[in-house]
Each structure stands twice: as C-alpha cells, then as structure tokens.
C-alpha cells in the first residue's frame, strides 16, 4: 500500500502548517509506515494517510510524486 506522510523536519519546533512537508512510501500497513519513518529520520510525523483509488491517482499527477525508500528496508 502507498502512504502519504505529513511531517515537520524536526521534533523540536512546534508544528506549523506552513512548514509541513510530505513524503510517500510503500508499506504493508500504517504501523510499518510509521516505524520506517521514525527509524530512519528525525521527523515529527503529523499524519499518515493510506492512498488508494482516486486519491492515489491524483497524487501521482503531481510532478513531485516519488516513493521514498530507506536503506534499512533492504534487510
């Protein structure tokens, strides 16, 4: 499944909508997606949303859409 993760770059600064970033990743479930991000980044996760159907098709139209992979996934 593909997940959209909304996050802040670090956990020190309070979250602000204006500084929220997005990444997309493939994981078996939302818990696995959260674990991947937490284990490989210092990000403050705001929301993890599963993308399917029209939502996924819409996101794929964005030229910045790309799946993020982490080296620890290669175990």
UniProtKB/Swiss-Prot annotation:
Reaction(s) catalysed by this chain's protein: RNA(n) + a ribonucleoside 5'-triphosphate = RNA(n+1) + diphosphate
The keyword RNA-binding appears for this protein: no
Annotated coiled-coil segments of the chain: none
NCBIfam families with a match to the protein in the record: PRK13667.1 (NF010188)
Family classification: Belongs to the RNA polymerase subunit epsilon family.
Role noted for this protein: A non-essential component of RNA polymerase (RNAP).
Record-given protein name: DNA-directed RNA polymerase subunit epsilon
Organism name: Lactobacillus gasseri (strain ATCC 33323 / DSM 20243 / BCRC 14619 / CIP 102991 / JCM 1131 / KCTC 3163 / NCIMB 11718 / NCTC 13722 / AM63)
């Amino acid at each position: 499944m593909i997940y959209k993760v909304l996050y802040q770059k670090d956990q020190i600064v309070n979250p602000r909508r204006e500084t929220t970033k997005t990444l997309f990743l493939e994981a078996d479930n939302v818990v696995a997606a959260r674990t991947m991000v937490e284990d490989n980044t210092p990000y403050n996760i705001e929301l993890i949303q599963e993308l399917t159907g029209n939502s996924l098709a819409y996101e794929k139209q964005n030229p910045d859409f790309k799946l993020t992979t982490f080296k620890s996934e290669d175990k």
